[in-house]
Amino acid sequence: MGGERRRLSNWPMLHLKQSLKYGLCALLAFANGLAARAQYQTLLSHDLATLQVLRNGDWRQRLPLISLTGGDEIQISFDDFSAAYRRFTYDVVHCEADWTPSTQLFATDYAEGFAEGLTIDDVQPSRQTQVAYTHYAFALPNDQCRLTKSGNYEVRIYDERHELMARACFMVTEATMKARLTCTTNTDVDVNATHQQIAWAVDYQGVNVTQPDREIKTVVLQNGRWDDARINVRPQMQTPNGLAWQHCRALIFDAGNVYRKFECLAVDHPTMGIAEITWDGRCYHARLHTDEPRPNYVYDESAQGLFCVRNSDNRDNAILSDYVMVHFSLQTPLTSRPIYLNGHFTGDRFSPTCQLHYNETAGLYEAHLLLKQGYYSYQYLTPGSDGRMVPVASEGNFYQTKNFYHALVYYRGVGERTDRLVAVAMP
């Protein structure tokens, strides 16, 4: 492998006419547009991989979210395939509810110390791996940068030439308001079938909100996916003390199915979900069992899109875990619409590297990604008629699926200069 990341092919979709390609691009615009605006977790260089943004290093946390007054921290890490040490720096940028930078704030308005040009100094080379890399990590807040305002934050990571290499996003909340959320399978479109519906409410907790349409912004997320976020849905009820959403069709989600999963802990024998592991003289290849159609719901524990880096010894996972070329295959009827792998390890983006391509000889959709050893949960999505990404039909869509929902409440009072994150709700 020689320390270089193997790039994936961008094959043309079989039997897809040029005009249809343009149409599919339009269908994807909504999903990718919101993801791009959210600027969630994004790698901008093929030299970098495995960007993680975790609260207290806990991969089970659904959202990278900390309290303004708590003692938690956001831990950010990534790997660099160039292997040799590079001086990476980062800036911390406060953002509005829509993830655009807060142009009315100076850095001193949201951070004590420094918010620009900070050096990443926790650097470790990989050990005993076939694919060489250097691991970089840092945490916020730290001795140089202490955050003083709630809201959305984007960390911009630069190389020594000050070229933007990655964006890492997280949220800081304050307990100014209170929100509550419930999920039901008795929806306005079906009952105990293929959908789940969210009902929720916001209590102002004494905050004087005079123009809620202007002062309050809301986001509802399923499994932490910003590409499918429901933004500023109009509430059915407004009172002097709060807002409520009941029987709101915009808050109906596809139930989907339990995310598929695999675990690559060792390179000398297959582990969960892996059919075989081979060596090509440069790197290891892990071929997963073919993902077959799921006509029925079968309960299984899954992290619903999360992933965790680890190896069989569960020791020094960050620098002892190797990179493996993972081969995915999906048995599903040929379709004119593209099919994508989706999970937090893809950044919830639908890029060419995450697209599956049809292998006529095998009669399967296939994709391969270079991934760090560990546990991964994933699903297969395709553009729906409205442009939103929906589960591939053969994956199944069942009301029993255990999905994770969050509602975020942002507030900007009259005369204030930015959006604050004042409440977070989950079932």
Feature map (PLM): residue ranges:
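Basic K/R-rich, polyanion-interacting modules in nucleoproteins and related proteins
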Residues: 286-335, 427
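Low-complexity, Pro/Ser/Thr- and charge-rich linker/hinge segments at domain boundaries
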Residues: 42-43, 172-195, 398-422
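Bacterial Sec-dependent N-terminal signal peptides
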Residues: 1-40
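Aromatic-rich carbohydrate-binding modules that target alpha-glucans
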Residues: 111-136, 226-233, 327-373, 385-414
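Short acidic/polar inter-strand loop motif in beta-rich domains
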Residues: 99, 145, 159-165, 267-272, ...
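Short, compositionally biased P/S/T/A/G/V-rich stretches that sit at domain boundaries
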Residues: 39-68, 176-189, 302-315
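Ligand-binding face of N-terminal immunoglobulin V-set domains in extracellular IgSF glycoproteins
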Residues: 132-143, 150, 157
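Contiguous beta-strand segments within globular domains
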Residues: 51-96, 191-202, 316-328
